[in-house]
């Protein structure tokens, strides 16, 4: 999940600022409501390549059901609704009138809690979805279907939770207990699968298939469908928060929680996210954003982030402010006070490292994940925690490790690849994504390689913006999908609204194929080859964990 909006949310609250048209013929399910078309023609690729590999691209990190997270009132719209698109894609009632009360949308989109937006959703969408609209639904199922039809074959749906954000945000309909939120989001994902099945004619017939093993995923992809993996990105999994340095969970709770998540179908997991918890210290956010999120760490744990100066030539965390001045003058006394549970948001000059690494409970969780053949998500761990986690994985020769959205020190990439793990990039704009792909590939050992993206859709982070200069060198519609040449992709249309990646970037999930095709025009066949092998490499990595 993106750091920027979480920080902005805490900043506003802690500072006290509160003030193509419809398909005419329904699918086989009796009484199915009409849904938007995709603008993609042709039959999606099924089977394998001549070398026996599956072909398709990978989203390693998105949040389909985050509309139920954080109390269930922060995000507007749903990825599906039994009553159809008009019911699913409508604005939050609390955004009326004219978006004036939508202080969080206004703040994250325009930099001020004061503003307006046109609240109309389907069928006109005058203001949202948009690449920079963070509180409106980005993953409607027909938009995901467009991406699948154009070549996507794996999607990791990260169930997301953050107790502190839920408790601070004033509007809510759901519990703030993180495990309750994860259970609800897993249930909603199953309900979406069943909804798509009904539209396709019955159980198992839909294109959206939740999978629980690499073998099952490979079978689904060979059928030409989308394999959906459940992951977890929670700030206090299993209730493992901190209270003035004391853990609020036990090994028994961790074991019980892992068993429950595994039974829910979860196969990939983070052990910490945004705030220090009883399992590990986090990788900091920087600058003014980090200052505000640091306040959230204090609200949630009773302590501010704790950082020492460390070498810039070794893995480290992002710098945090304020640094220097009093932070340098009082560095010694501040270190001494830590032993008495007293912290202050003052830091030394230079490179910063979180003093908190992987705790004994965190080691227990990592070992428990390995025992259950789950994928360990390295992102969001402090450099110290990530180093210890990688050491545990190396000692066990365990390949199930992933950096899914550019939130770990790049110096660890070689160790991830050395284990047989996988790396994906955050969904940056086209040119930044290409640069990350090139840097990451240069760190690979030269063997079989595939790459993916972590779009972080519905993670309250921006989607890829329009490419600068696109007006001079645009993606031309319609185009043949570079991932699946058997299909042709035209502009995406939902209701009365038509989107164009050249002018709007990735306004919603349906424009992912356009973003990929545009990058293919910029970087050529090599990036298309590597993205088309994203699904295969993910399955190989996952498969090695189960042997």
PLM-predicted stretches and their roles:
Residues 374-381:
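Catalytic beta/alpha-barrel core
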Residues 29-353, 360-367, 371, 384-394, ...:
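N-terminal hydrophobic targeting/anchoring segments and the immediately downstream early-domain regions
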